[in-house]
Amino acid sequence: MGAIETQGFKLDDSGRRIVVDPVTRIEGHMRCEVNVDANNVIRNAVSTGTMWRGLEVILKGRDPRDAWAFVERICGVCTGCHALTSVRAVEDALGIRIPKNAHLIREMMAKTLQVHDHAVHFYHLHALDWVDVVSALKADPKKTSELQHLVSPSHPLSSPGYFPRRGRTGLKKFVESGQLGPFMNGYWGSKAYVLPPEANLMAVTHYLEALDLQKEWVKVHAIFGGKNPHPNYLVGGVPCAINLDGNGAAGRINMERLNFVKARIDEMIEFNKNVYLPDVLAIGTIYKQAGWLHGGGLSALNVADYGTYDKVAYDHATHQLPGGVILDGNWDEIHAIDPRDPEQVQEFVAHSWYQYADESKGLHPWDGVTEPKFELGARTKGTRTAIEHIDESAKYSWIKSPRWRGHAVEVGPLSRYILGYAHALKGNKYCQRVKEQVDFAAEAINHAIPKALGLPETQYTLKQLLPTTIGRTLARCLEGQYCGEMMLADYHELVANIRAGDTATANVEKWDPATWPKEAKGVGTVAAPRGMLGHWIRIKDGKIENYQCVVPTTWNGSPRDAKGQIGAFEASLLGTPMVNPEQPVEILRTLHSFDPCLACSTHVMSEDGRELTTVKVR
Protein backbone atom coordinates (compact mmCIF):
# COMPACT_ATOMS: atom_id res chain seq x y z
CA MET A 1 0.00 0.00 0.00
CA GLY A 2 2.73 2.45 0.94
CA ALA A 3 1.68 5.96 1.96
CA ILE A 4 -1.76 7.27 0.96
CA GLU A 5 -4.09 10.04 2.10
CA THR A 6 -7.83 9.78 2.75
CA GLN A 7 -10.29 12.08 4.53
CA GLY A 8 -7.36 14.21 5.67
CA PHE A 9 -5.63 11.22 7.31
CA LYS A 10 -2.26 9.93 6.16
CA LEU A 11 -1.87 6.15 6.13
CA ASP A 12 1.51 4.44 5.90
CA ASP A 13 1.97 0.68 6.27
CA SER A 14 5.76 0.74 5.99
CA GLY A 15 6.41 0.50 9.74
CA ARG A 16 6.32 -2.46 12.11
CA ARG A 17 3.02 -4.37 12.01
CA ILE A 18 1.26 -5.32 15.24
CA VAL A 19 -1.79 -7.59 15.31
CA VAL A 20 -4.43 -7.76 18.05
CA ASP A 21 -6.66 -10.75 17.36
CA PRO A 22 -9.40 -11.15 18.36
CA VAL A 23 -10.93 -8.03 19.84
CA THR A 24 -14.32 -9.34 20.89
CA ARG A 25 -17.43 -7.30 20.13
CA ILE A 26 -21.20 -7.67 20.12
CA GLU A 27 -21.52 -8.99 16.57
CA GLY A 28 -18.62 -11.40 17.00
CA HIS A 29 -14.90 -10.86 17.07
CA MET A 30 -12.79 -8.02 15.77
CA ARG A 31 -9.18 -8.11 14.69
CA CYS A 32 -7.05 -4.98 14.71
CA GLU A 33 -3.73 -4.48 12.95
CA VAL A 34 -1.61 -1.34 13.19
CA ASN A 35 1.67 -0.13 11.76
CA VAL A 36 3.93 1.92 14.02
CA ASP A 37 6.82 4.10 12.89
CA ALA A 38 10.29 4.35 14.42
CA ASN A 39 8.87 6.58 17.18
CA ASN A 40 6.11 4.05 17.99
CA VAL A 41 3.38 6.31 16.59
CA ILE A 42 0.50 4.52 14.85
CA ARG A 43 0.53 5.35 11.13
CA ASN A 44 -1.89 2.76 9.76
CA ALA A 45 -4.82 0.88 11.29
CA VAL A 46 -6.91 -1.99 9.94
CA SER A 47 -10.13 -3.11 11.64
CA THR A 48 -11.46 -6.56 10.71
CA GLY A 49 -14.73 -8.20 11.74
CA THR A 50 -13.93 -11.92 11.84
CA MET A 51 -17.33 -13.51 12.35
CA TRP A 52 -20.44 -13.46 10.18
CA ARG A 53 -23.71 -12.89 12.05
CA GLY A 54 -26.15 -13.82 9.27
CA LEU A 55 -29.35 -13.22 11.25
CA GLU A 56 -30.87 -11.27 8.37
CA VAL A 57 -30.89 -14.49 6.35
CA ILE A 58 -32.40 -16.49 9.22
CA LEU A 59 -35.35 -14.06 9.44
CA LYS A 60 -36.50 -14.43 5.86
CA GLY A 61 -39.88 -16.14 5.60
CA ARG A 62 -40.72 -15.74 9.30
CA ASP A 63 -43.61 -13.96 10.98
CA PRO A 64 -42.60 -10.29 11.45
CA ARG A 65 -44.22 -10.27 14.90
CA ASP A 66 -41.54 -12.75 16.01
CA ALA A 67 -38.57 -10.89 14.55
CA TRP A 68 -37.79 -9.04 17.78
CA ALA A 69 -37.13 -12.30 19.65
CA PHE A 70 -34.54 -13.38 17.08
CA VAL A 71 -32.69 -10.11 16.58
CA GLU A 72 -32.57 -9.45 20.33
CA ARG A 73 -30.13 -12.35 20.52
CA ILE A 74 -27.61 -10.37 18.49
CA CYS A 75 -26.43 -9.07 21.86
CA GLY A 76 -26.97 -9.87 25.51
CA VAL A 77 -25.11 -6.82 26.82
CA CYS A 78 -27.05 -4.01 25.15
CA THR A 79 -30.03 -6.23 25.81
CA GLY A 80 -33.39 -5.15 24.46
CA CYS A 81 -32.23 -2.49 22.01
CA HIS A 82 -32.46 -4.77 18.97
CA ALA A 83 -35.89 -5.97 20.09
CA LEU A 84 -37.12 -2.40 20.45
CA THR A 85 -35.72 -1.46 17.05
CA SER A 86 -37.41 -4.48 15.49
CA VAL A 87 -40.89 -3.83 16.88
CA ARG A 88 -40.58 -0.21 15.80
CA ALA A 89 -39.71 -1.33 12.26
CA VAL A 90 -42.73 -3.65 12.10
CA GLU A 91 -45.03 -0.99 13.59
CA ASP A 92 -43.74 1.52 11.06
CA ALA A 93 -44.45 -0.89 8.22
CA LEU A 94 -47.98 -1.66 9.41
CA GLY A 95 -48.93 1.84 10.58
CA ILE A 96 -49.30 0.91 14.26
CA ARG A 97 -49.11 3.55 17.00
CA ILE A 98 -48.66 2.38 20.57
CA PRO A 99 -50.44 3.72 23.70
CA LYS A 100 -48.85 6.42 25.83
CA ASN A 101 -48.12 4.02 28.69
CA ALA A 102 -46.32 1.66 26.32
CA HIS A 103 -44.25 4.55 24.97
CA LEU A 104 -43.21 5.64 28.46
CA ILE A 105 -42.40 2.09 29.58
CA ARG A 106 -40.30 1.49 26.46
CA GLU A 107 -38.49 4.77 27.09
CA MET A 108 -37.74 3.78 30.68
CA MET A 109 -36.46 0.37 29.61
CA ALA A 110 -34.24 1.94 26.94
CA LYS A 111 -32.84 4.52 29.36
CA THR A 112 -32.27 1.88 32.04
CA LEU A 113 -30.15 0.06 29.49
CA GLN A 114 -28.14 3.21 28.74
CA VAL A 115 -27.42 3.93 32.41
CA HIS A 116 -26.55 0.31 33.15
CA ASP A 117 -24.52 -0.29 30.01
CA HIS A 118 -22.51 2.92 30.28
CA ALA A 119 -21.61 2.34 33.94
CA VAL A 120 -20.70 -1.30 33.39
CA HIS A 121 -18.71 -0.37 30.30
CA PHE A 122 -16.66 2.25 32.09
CA TYR A 123 -15.95 0.48 35.37
CA HIS A 124 -15.71 -3.13 34.26
CA LEU A 125 -14.59 -2.93 30.64
CA HIS A 126 -12.81 0.37 30.05
CA ALA A 127 -11.55 1.92 33.30
CA LEU A 128 -8.67 -0.52 33.54
CA ASP A 129 -7.24 1.06 30.39
CA TRP A 130 -6.75 4.18 32.52
CA VAL A 131 -6.37 2.71 36.02
CA ASP A 132 -3.32 0.78 37.25
CA VAL A 133 -4.90 -1.73 39.61
CA VAL A 134 -1.72 -2.91 41.31
CA SER A 135 -0.64 0.70 41.92
CA ALA A 136 -3.74 1.07 44.11
CA LEU A 137 -2.01 -1.07 46.75
CA LYS A 138 0.45 1.78 47.32
CA ALA A 139 -2.28 4.33 47.99
CA ASP A 140 -2.60 6.21 51.27
CA PRO A 141 -6.25 5.73 52.40
CA LYS A 142 -6.33 9.17 54.01
CA LYS A 143 -5.13 10.85 50.83
CA THR A 144 -7.61 8.77 48.84
CA SER A 145 -10.39 10.04 51.08
CA GLU A 146 -9.18 13.60 50.58
CA LEU A 147 -9.15 13.08 46.82
CA GLN A 148 -12.69 11.71 46.95
CA HIS A 149 -13.84 14.80 48.87
CA LEU A 150 -12.17 17.07 46.32
CA VAL A 151 -13.78 15.52 43.24
CA SER A 152 -17.10 14.48 44.83
CA PRO A 153 -17.86 16.26 48.11
CA SER A 154 -21.38 14.81 48.41
CA HIS A 155 -20.47 11.13 48.12
CA PRO A 156 -21.20 9.55 51.53
CA LEU A 157 -18.79 6.61 51.10
CA SER A 158 -15.55 8.52 51.39
CA SER A 159 -14.05 8.01 54.85
CA PRO A 160 -10.35 7.03 55.18
CA GLY A 161 -11.42 3.68 56.62
CA TYR A 162 -13.76 2.88 53.74
CA PHE A 163 -11.16 2.54 51.00
CA PRO A 164 -8.95 -0.09 52.69
CA ARG A 165 -12.03 -2.03 53.77
CA ARG A 166 -13.86 -1.88 50.44
CA GLY A 167 -11.10 -1.73 47.87
CA ARG A 168 -7.55 -2.36 49.00
CA THR A 169 -8.01 -5.38 51.26
CA GLY A 170 -9.73 -7.50 48.64
CA LEU A 171 -7.30 -6.39 45.96
CA LYS A 172 -4.33 -7.25 48.18
CA LYS A 173 -5.67 -10.78 48.65
CA PHE A 174 -5.93 -11.17 44.88
CA VAL A 175 -2.32 -10.03 44.38
CA GLU A 176 -0.86 -12.09 47.22
CA SER A 177 -2.63 -15.22 45.98
CA GLY A 178 -1.02 -14.80 42.58
CA GLN A 179 -4.48 -14.99 41.05
CA LEU A 180 -5.66 -11.54 40.01
CA GLY A 181 -9.05 -12.81 38.88
CA PRO A 182 -10.81 -10.09 36.87
CA PHE A 183 -7.59 -8.05 36.89
CA MET A 184 -5.48 -10.67 35.08
CA ASN A 185 -3.56 -9.84 31.91
CA GLY A 186 -3.24 -6.13 32.59
CA TYR A 187 -0.13 -4.09 31.96
CA TRP A 188 0.18 -2.94 35.54
CA GLY A 189 3.22 -0.75 35.98
CA SER A 190 3.27 0.43 32.37
CA LYS A 191 4.31 4.05 31.90
CA ALA A 192 1.14 4.48 29.83
CA TYR A 193 -0.68 4.75 33.17
CA VAL A 194 -0.35 8.20 34.75
CA LEU A 195 -2.80 8.25 37.68
CA PRO A 196 -1.44 8.55 41.22
CA PRO A 197 -2.03 5.52 43.50
CA GLU A 198 -4.85 7.31 45.34
CA ALA A 199 -6.82 7.87 42.13
CA ASN A 200 -6.28 4.23 41.24
CA LEU A 201 -7.58 3.06 44.62
CA MET A 202 -10.60 5.35 44.35
CA ALA A 203 -11.45 3.94 40.92
CA VAL A 204 -10.94 0.30 41.95
CA THR A 205 -13.22 0.83 44.95
CA HIS A 206 -15.89 2.32 42.70
CA TYR A 207 -15.41 -0.63 40.33
CA LEU A 208 -16.67 -2.83 43.18
CA GLU A 209 -19.52 -0.45 44.05
CA ALA A 210 -20.72 -0.49 40.45
CA LEU A 211 -20.55 -4.28 40.41
CA ASP A 212 -23.07 -4.39 43.25
CA LEU A 213 -25.42 -1.76 41.84
CA GLN A 214 -25.64 -2.90 38.22
CA LYS A 215 -27.40 -6.14 39.16
CA GLU A 216 -30.11 -4.10 40.90
CA TRP A 217 -30.69 -1.68 38.03
CA VAL A 218 -31.49 -4.39 35.48
CA LYS A 219 -34.46 -5.45 37.61
CA VAL A 220 -36.34 -2.60 35.94
CA HIS A 221 -36.23 -4.74 32.79
CA ALA A 222 -37.51 -7.73 34.73
CA ILE A 223 -40.49 -5.73 36.02
CA PHE A 224 -41.54 -4.31 32.65
CA GLY A 225 -40.19 -7.02 30.34
CA GLY A 226 -40.30 -10.17 32.43
CA LYS A 227 -36.55 -10.84 32.56
CA ASN A 228 -33.03 -9.67 31.89
CA PRO A 229 -31.18 -10.26 29.66
CA HIS A 230 -33.51 -10.33 26.67
CA PRO A 231 -36.66 -8.73 28.11
CA ASN A 232 -39.90 -9.34 26.26
CA TYR A 233 -41.36 -6.87 23.78
CA LEU A 234 -44.57 -6.80 21.77
CA VAL A 235 -45.52 -5.41 18.38
CA GLY A 236 -48.10 -2.78 19.31
CA GLY A 237 -46.89 -2.01 22.83
CA VAL A 238 -45.42 -3.78 25.83
CA PRO A 239 -46.33 -7.21 27.30
CA CYS A 240 -47.05 -6.02 30.85
CA ALA A 241 -50.54 -5.16 32.09
CA ILE A 242 -51.27 -2.43 34.65
CA ASN A 243 -53.37 -2.68 37.80
CA LEU A 244 -52.35 -0.27 40.54
CA ASP A 245 -54.54 -2.07 43.08
CA GLY A 246 -52.46 -5.19 42.69
CA ASN A 247 -55.34 -7.43 41.67
CA GLY A 248 -55.42 -9.74 38.67
CA ALA A 249 -52.75 -11.78 36.97
CA ALA A 250 -49.33 -12.20 38.52
CA GLY A 251 -46.80 -9.81 37.07
CA ARG A 252 -49.17 -6.92 36.56
CA ILE A 253 -47.68 -3.50 37.23
CA ASN A 254 -48.86 -2.15 40.57
CA MET A 255 -47.62 0.60 42.87
CA GLU A 256 -45.30 -1.75 44.74
CA ARG A 257 -43.46 -2.52 41.53
CA LEU A 258 -43.52 1.11 40.41
CA ASN A 259 -42.07 2.20 43.76
CA PHE A 260 -39.30 -0.34 43.27
CA VAL A 261 -38.57 1.16 39.85
CA LYS A 262 -38.48 4.64 41.39
CA ALA A 263 -35.93 3.49 43.97
CA ARG A 264 -33.69 2.10 41.22
CA ILE A 265 -33.93 5.35 39.25
CA ASP A 266 -32.89 7.30 42.34
CA GLU A 267 -29.89 4.98 42.75
CA MET A 268 -28.85 5.54 39.16
CA ILE A 269 -29.06 9.30 39.48
CA GLU A 270 -27.07 9.35 42.72
CA PHE A 271 -24.37 7.01 41.43
CA ASN A 272 -23.89 9.05 38.27
CA LYS A 273 -23.76 12.28 40.26
CA ASN A 274 -21.51 11.16 43.12
CA VAL A 275 -19.31 8.47 41.56
CA TYR A 276 -19.32 7.98 37.79
CA LEU A 277 -19.12 11.60 36.61
CA PRO A 278 -16.56 12.71 39.24
CA ASP A 279 -14.36 9.72 38.42
CA VAL A 280 -14.43 10.37 34.67
CA LEU A 281 -13.76 14.08 35.16
CA ALA A 282 -10.85 13.42 37.53
CA ILE A 283 -9.29 10.71 35.35
CA GLY A 284 -9.85 12.77 32.21
CA THR A 285 -8.27 15.84 33.80
CA ILE A 286 -5.13 14.00 34.90
CA TYR A 287 -4.64 12.33 31.51
CA LYS A 288 -5.35 15.60 29.73
CA GLN A 289 -2.66 17.23 31.87
CA ALA A 290 -0.32 14.48 30.66
CA GLY A 291 -1.09 15.45 27.07
CA TRP A 292 -3.34 12.49 26.28
CA LEU A 293 -5.76 14.10 23.83
CA HIS A 294 -5.55 11.37 21.21
CA GLY A 295 -8.12 9.11 19.59
CA GLY A 296 -10.52 11.61 18.03
CA GLY A 297 -10.44 10.30 14.50
CA LEU A 298 -13.70 10.81 12.63
CA SER A 299 -15.39 12.44 15.64
CA ALA A 300 -13.48 15.63 14.81
CA LEU A 301 -15.00 15.52 11.32
CA ASN A 302 -18.17 13.54 10.68
CA VAL A 303 -20.73 12.43 13.28
CA ALA A 304 -24.27 11.13 12.90
CA ASP A 305 -27.32 9.96 14.82
CA TYR A 306 -30.99 9.38 14.00
CA GLY A 307 -32.17 11.29 17.10
CA THR A 308 -33.89 9.81 20.12
CA TYR A 309 -36.00 10.19 23.25
CA ASP A 310 -39.14 11.97 22.03
CA LYS A 311 -40.53 14.21 24.74
CA VAL A 312 -43.85 13.80 22.91
CA ALA A 313 -44.37 10.39 21.36
CA TYR A 314 -43.97 10.31 17.55
CA ASP A 315 -42.97 13.99 17.46
CA HIS A 316 -39.33 13.86 16.38
CA ALA A 317 -39.04 17.61 16.77
CA THR A 318 -39.13 16.92 20.52
CA HIS A 319 -36.09 14.61 20.53
CA GLN A 320 -34.15 15.26 23.73
CA LEU A 321 -31.05 14.05 21.90
CA PRO A 322 -31.71 15.39 18.40
CA GLY A 323 -30.33 13.70 15.33
CA GLY A 324 -28.60 14.81 12.18
CA VAL A 325 -25.19 14.73 10.55
CA ILE A 326 -22.24 17.07 10.99
CA LEU A 327 -19.56 17.02 8.30
CA ASP A 328 -15.99 18.32 8.27
CA GLY A 329 -16.20 19.44 11.91
CA ASN A 330 -18.65 22.24 11.06
CA TRP A 331 -20.89 22.40 14.14
CA ASP A 332 -22.74 25.37 12.64
CA GLU A 333 -24.39 23.21 9.97
CA ILE A 334 -26.52 20.18 10.84
CA HIS A 335 -27.72 18.07 7.93
CA ALA A 336 -31.07 16.29 8.29
CA ILE A 337 -30.91 12.50 8.34
CA ASP A 338 -33.60 10.20 6.96
CA PRO A 339 -33.09 6.42 7.23
CA ARG A 340 -35.76 5.94 4.54
CA ASP A 341 -33.90 7.89 1.88
CA PRO A 342 -32.08 5.46 -0.45
CA GLU A 343 -29.49 8.15 -1.22
CA GLN A 344 -28.57 8.70 2.43
CA VAL A 345 -27.89 5.38 4.16
CA GLN A 346 -26.06 2.89 1.96
CA GLU A 347 -23.84 -0.10 2.66
CA PHE A 348 -20.77 -0.87 0.56
CA VAL A 349 -18.87 -4.16 0.31
CA ALA A 350 -15.76 -3.38 -1.75
CA HIS A 351 -13.56 -4.43 1.20
CA SER A 352 -16.09 -6.70 2.95
CA TRP A 353 -16.48 -10.47 2.61
CA TYR A 354 -19.79 -10.08 0.75
CA GLN A 355 -20.69 -9.67 -2.89
CA TYR A 356 -22.91 -7.26 -4.83
CA ALA A 357 -23.60 -7.23 -8.54
CA ASP A 358 -21.76 -3.89 -8.68
CA GLU A 359 -19.40 -3.44 -5.74
CA SER A 360 -18.57 0.14 -6.66
CA LYS A 361 -22.08 1.10 -5.54
CA GLY A 362 -23.83 0.94 -2.19
CA LEU A 363 -27.26 -0.47 -1.37
CA HIS A 364 -29.92 0.99 0.88
CA PRO A 365 -30.87 -1.52 3.62
CA TRP A 366 -34.38 -2.05 2.19
CA ASP A 367 -32.63 -3.38 -0.90
CA GLY A 368 -29.76 -4.90 1.04
CA VAL A 369 -28.08 -8.14 0.01
CA THR A 370 -26.21 -10.35 2.47
CA GLU A 371 -24.33 -12.87 0.32
CA PRO A 372 -21.00 -13.98 1.80
CA LYS A 373 -17.85 -14.11 -0.30
CA PHE A 374 -14.76 -14.99 1.72
CA GLU A 375 -11.54 -14.38 -0.14
CA LEU A 376 -8.10 -13.12 0.84
CA GLY A 377 -5.95 -10.59 -0.95
CA ALA A 378 -2.65 -11.41 -2.59
CA ARG A 379 -0.67 -9.59 0.14
CA THR A 380 -2.20 -11.66 2.95
CA LYS A 381 0.32 -13.53 5.09
CA GLY A 382 -0.78 -16.89 6.42
CA THR A 383 -3.65 -19.16 5.41
CA ARG A 384 -7.44 -18.93 5.27
CA THR A 385 -7.67 -20.43 8.76
CA ALA A 386 -4.59 -18.80 10.30
CA ILE A 387 -4.14 -15.26 9.03
CA GLU A 388 -0.97 -13.60 10.26
CA HIS A 389 -1.26 -10.33 8.34
CA ILE A 390 -4.36 -9.11 6.48
CA ASP A 391 -4.30 -7.45 3.07
CA GLU A 392 -6.36 -4.29 3.45
CA SER A 393 -6.15 -3.53 -0.26
CA ALA A 394 -8.58 -6.43 -0.82
CA LYS A 395 -11.62 -7.71 1.09
CA TYR A 396 -10.73 -7.99 4.78
CA SER A 397 -13.81 -7.88 7.02
CA TRP A 398 -17.21 -9.46 7.66
CA ILE A 399 -18.49 -5.97 8.45
CA LYS A 400 -20.01 -3.94 5.64
CA SER A 401 -19.19 -0.25 5.15
CA PRO A 402 -22.25 1.94 5.79
CA ARG A 403 -21.98 5.52 4.63
CA TRP A 404 -24.18 8.61 4.89
CA ARG A 405 -24.36 10.19 1.43
CA GLY A 406 -21.00 8.58 0.77
CA HIS A 407 -19.34 9.88 3.95
CA ALA A 408 -17.80 7.71 6.66
CA VAL A 409 -19.16 8.87 10.04
CA GLU A 410 -18.68 8.10 13.71
CA VAL A 411 -21.71 7.14 15.78
CA GLY A 412 -22.22 6.77 19.53
CA PRO A 413 -22.70 8.89 22.65
CA LEU A 414 -19.95 11.31 21.58
CA SER A 415 -21.70 11.86 18.24
CA ARG A 416 -25.03 12.35 20.02
CA TYR A 417 -23.48 14.90 22.38
CA ILE A 418 -21.73 16.85 19.65
CA LEU A 419 -25.04 16.96 17.76
CA GLY A 420 -27.00 17.81 20.91
CA TYR A 421 -24.63 20.66 21.73
CA ALA A 422 -24.85 21.99 18.18
CA HIS A 423 -28.66 21.83 18.27
CA ALA A 424 -28.70 23.59 21.65
CA LEU A 425 -26.57 26.41 20.25
CA LYS A 426 -29.25 26.86 17.60
CA GLY A 427 -31.89 27.29 20.31
CA ASN A 428 -33.43 23.81 20.45
CA LYS A 429 -35.22 23.85 23.82
CA TYR A 430 -35.37 20.07 24.14
CA CYS A 431 -31.62 19.55 24.46
CA GLN A 432 -30.42 22.51 26.53
CA ARG A 433 -29.52 20.04 29.28
CA VAL A 434 -26.86 18.62 26.95
CA LYS A 435 -25.22 22.03 26.66
CA GLU A 436 -25.36 22.49 30.44
CA GLN A 437 -23.65 19.13 30.98
CA VAL A 438 -20.92 19.72 28.40
CA ASP A 439 -20.17 23.24 29.62
CA PHE A 440 -19.99 21.99 33.22
CA ALA A 441 -17.62 19.17 32.26
CA ALA A 442 -15.36 21.46 30.22
CA GLU A 443 -15.13 23.97 33.07
CA ALA A 444 -14.35 21.15 35.51
CA ILE A 445 -11.59 19.66 33.33
CA ASN A 446 -10.04 23.02 32.44
CA HIS A 447 -10.37 24.81 35.76
CA ALA A 448 -12.20 23.36 38.78
CA ILE A 449 -10.47 19.98 39.06
CA PRO A 450 -6.95 21.19 38.18
CA LYS A 451 -7.34 23.93 40.78
CA ALA A 452 -8.55 21.45 43.40
CA LEU A 453 -5.70 19.04 42.65
CA GLY A 454 -3.03 21.72 42.51
CA LEU A 455 -2.50 21.30 38.76
CA PRO A 456 -2.18 24.03 36.13
CA GLU A 457 -5.48 25.28 34.74
CA THR A 458 -5.98 24.93 30.99
CA GLN A 459 -7.95 26.61 28.21
CA TYR A 460 -8.87 23.74 25.91
CA THR A 461 -11.81 24.41 23.62
CA LEU A 462 -14.68 21.95 23.21
CA LYS A 463 -13.36 20.97 19.79
CA GLN A 464 -10.07 20.06 21.46
CA LEU A 465 -11.63 18.18 24.39
CA LEU A 466 -14.62 16.32 22.94
CA PRO A 467 -13.25 14.65 19.77
CA THR A 468 -10.79 12.49 21.74
CA THR A 469 -10.73 9.15 23.52
CA ILE A 470 -11.30 11.07 26.77
CA GLY A 471 -14.21 12.96 25.19
CA ARG A 472 -15.77 9.73 23.93
CA THR A 473 -15.58 8.29 27.45
CA LEU A 474 -16.95 11.49 28.98
CA ALA A 475 -19.90 11.66 26.57
CA ARG A 476 -20.93 8.13 27.53
CA CYS A 477 -20.91 9.18 31.19
CA LEU A 478 -22.90 12.37 30.52
CA GLU A 479 -25.47 10.40 28.55
CA GLY A 480 -25.90 7.99 31.46
CA GLN A 481 -26.51 10.93 33.78
CA TYR A 482 -28.99 12.51 31.35
CA CYS A 483 -30.88 9.25 30.85
CA GLY A 484 -31.36 8.85 34.59
CA GLU A 485 -32.83 12.35 34.78
CA MET A 486 -35.11 11.77 31.78
CA MET A 487 -36.20 8.44 33.22
CA LEU A 488 -37.36 10.11 36.41
CA ALA A 489 -39.55 12.45 34.35
CA ASP A 490 -40.90 9.45 32.40
CA TYR A 491 -41.73 7.70 35.67
CA HIS A 492 -43.75 10.61 37.03
CA GLU A 493 -45.56 11.00 33.71
CA LEU A 494 -46.40 7.29 33.65
CA VAL A 495 -47.80 7.28 37.19
CA ALA A 496 -49.84 10.43 36.51
CA ASN A 497 -51.26 8.94 33.30
CA ILE A 498 -52.24 5.72 35.06
CA ARG A 499 -53.83 7.61 37.95
CA ALA A 500 -55.85 9.56 35.37
CA GLY A 501 -57.45 6.26 34.36
CA ASP A 502 -55.38 5.17 31.35
CA THR A 503 -54.14 1.59 31.78
CA ALA A 504 -53.68 0.62 28.12
CA THR A 505 -50.31 -0.91 27.29
CA ALA A 506 -50.89 -2.35 23.80
CA ASN A 507 -52.66 -1.56 20.54
CA VAL A 508 -53.74 -4.88 19.01
CA GLU A 509 -55.99 -3.54 16.24
CA LYS A 510 -53.58 -4.83 13.59
CA TRP A 511 -52.38 -7.96 15.35
CA ASP A 512 -54.20 -10.20 12.87
CA PRO A 513 -52.18 -10.54 9.61
CA ALA A 514 -55.50 -10.40 7.74
CA THR A 515 -55.52 -6.66 8.49
CA TRP A 516 -52.11 -6.09 6.89
CA PRO A 517 -51.45 -4.88 3.34
CA LYS A 518 -50.10 -7.43 0.88
CA GLU A 519 -46.73 -5.67 0.89
CA ALA A 520 -45.24 -3.21 3.38
CA LYS A 521 -41.89 -1.88 4.44
CA GLY A 522 -40.73 -0.09 7.58
CA VAL A 523 -37.74 1.13 9.50
CA GLY A 524 -37.06 1.29 13.22
CA THR A 525 -34.30 3.24 14.92
CA VAL A 526 -32.93 3.30 18.46
CA ALA A 527 -30.11 5.06 20.27
CA ALA A 528 -28.21 1.94 21.30
CA PRO A 529 -25.45 2.36 23.90
CA ARG A 530 -22.79 2.28 21.18
CA GLY A 531 -24.56 4.45 18.61
CA MET A 532 -27.39 4.72 16.13
CA LEU A 533 -29.10 1.44 15.35
CA GLY A 534 -31.45 0.80 12.45
CA HIS A 535 -33.53 -2.16 11.29
CA TRP A 536 -35.19 -2.21 7.86
CA ILE A 537 -37.94 -4.71 7.02
CA ARG A 538 -39.91 -5.71 3.94
CA ILE A 539 -43.10 -7.70 4.53
CA LYS A 540 -44.87 -9.65 1.78
CA ASP A 541 -47.90 -11.93 2.18
CA GLY A 542 -47.58 -11.74 5.96
CA LYS A 543 -43.95 -12.91 6.05
CA ILE A 544 -40.55 -11.23 6.18
CA GLU A 545 -39.26 -10.83 2.63
CA ASN A 546 -36.07 -8.99 3.58
CA TYR A 547 -34.53 -7.79 6.83
CA GLN A 548 -31.37 -5.75 7.34
CA CYS A 549 -29.70 -4.46 10.50
CA VAL A 550 -27.14 -1.67 10.44
CA VAL A 551 -25.69 -1.64 13.93
CA PRO A 552 -23.40 0.93 15.58
CA THR A 553 -20.29 -1.20 15.23
CA THR A 554 -21.04 -1.60 11.53
CA TRP A 555 -20.66 2.17 11.23
CA ASN A 556 -17.67 2.49 13.56
CA GLY A 557 -15.88 -0.74 12.72
CA SER A 558 -16.40 -0.59 8.98
CA PRO A 559 -13.53 -1.41 6.65
CA ARG A 560 -12.48 0.85 3.82
CA ASP A 561 -15.08 1.54 1.14
CA ALA A 562 -14.76 1.72 -2.65
CA LYS A 563 -13.28 5.22 -2.33
CA GLY A 564 -10.70 4.06 0.21
CA GLN A 565 -12.36 5.91 3.11
CA ILE A 566 -11.56 4.43 6.52
CA GLY A 567 -14.02 3.83 9.35
CA ALA A 568 -14.11 5.31 12.86
CA PHE A 569 -12.10 2.56 14.60
CA GLU A 570 -9.31 2.83 12.08
CA ALA A 571 -9.28 6.64 12.07
CA SER A 572 -9.25 6.89 15.87
CA LEU A 573 -5.95 5.05 16.24
CA LEU A 574 -3.97 7.13 13.76
CA GLY A 575 -1.37 9.43 15.26
CA THR A 576 -1.52 7.80 18.69
CA PRO A 577 1.92 7.43 20.32
CA MET A 578 2.60 4.18 22.17
CA VAL A 579 4.87 3.96 25.18
CA ASN A 580 5.62 0.32 24.46
CA PRO A 581 4.11 -1.57 21.49
CA GLU A 582 4.59 -4.82 23.41
CA GLN A 583 2.14 -3.47 25.99
CA PRO A 584 -0.46 -1.83 23.73
CA VAL A 585 -2.49 -0.08 26.41
CA GLU A 586 -3.14 2.84 24.06
CA ILE A 587 -4.73 0.65 21.36
CA LEU A 588 -7.10 -0.90 23.88
CA ARG A 589 -7.84 2.44 25.52
CA THR A 590 -9.14 3.94 22.29
CA LEU A 591 -10.87 0.83 20.93
CA HIS A 592 -12.64 0.32 24.25
CA SER A 593 -13.87 3.91 24.23
CA PHE A 594 -16.26 2.78 21.47
CA ASP A 595 -17.59 0.12 23.90
CA PRO A 596 -16.74 -3.35 22.62
CA CYS A 597 -18.98 -5.44 24.82
CA LEU A 598 -17.54 -8.92 25.45
CA ALA A 599 -14.28 -10.29 26.82
CA CYS A 600 -11.71 -12.79 25.62
CA SER A 601 -7.98 -13.27 25.62
CA THR A 602 -6.13 -11.92 22.61
CA HIS A 603 -2.55 -12.07 21.48
CA VAL A 604 -0.32 -9.38 20.10
CA MET A 605 2.00 -10.69 17.41
CA SER A 606 4.91 -9.19 15.55
CA GLU A 607 4.79 -9.22 11.76
CA ASP A 608 6.61 -12.57 11.59
CA GLY A 609 3.97 -14.15 13.84
CA ARG A 610 6.10 -14.12 17.00
CA GLU A 611 3.93 -13.68 20.08
CA LEU A 612 4.90 -10.56 21.98
CA THR A 613 2.40 -10.54 24.80
CA THR A 614 -1.13 -11.41 25.82
CA VAL A 615 -3.80 -8.72 25.73
CA LYS A 616 -7.07 -8.75 27.63
CA VAL A 617 -9.79 -7.12 25.57
CA ARG A 618 -13.18 -6.59 27.13
Swiss-Prot record:
Enzyme Commission number(s) from the entry: 1.12.99.6
User: Key word Oxidoreductase present in the record?
Assistant: yes
A molecular function (GO) term: ferredoxin hydrogenase activity
User: Catalyses which reaction?
Assistant: H2 + A = AH2
Task: List keywords of the entry alphabetically.
Answer: Cell membrane, Membrane, Metal-binding, Nickel, Oxidoreductase
Which co-factor is required? Ni(2+)
State the annotated membrane topology for this chain: Peripheral membrane protein
For this chain, the family text in UniProt reads: Belongs to the [NiFe]/[NiFeSe] hydrogenase large subunit family.
Return the protein name: Uptake hydrogenase large subunit
Q: Which organism is it from?
A: Rubrivivax gelatinosus (Rhodocyclus gelatinosus)
Give the gene symbol. hupB
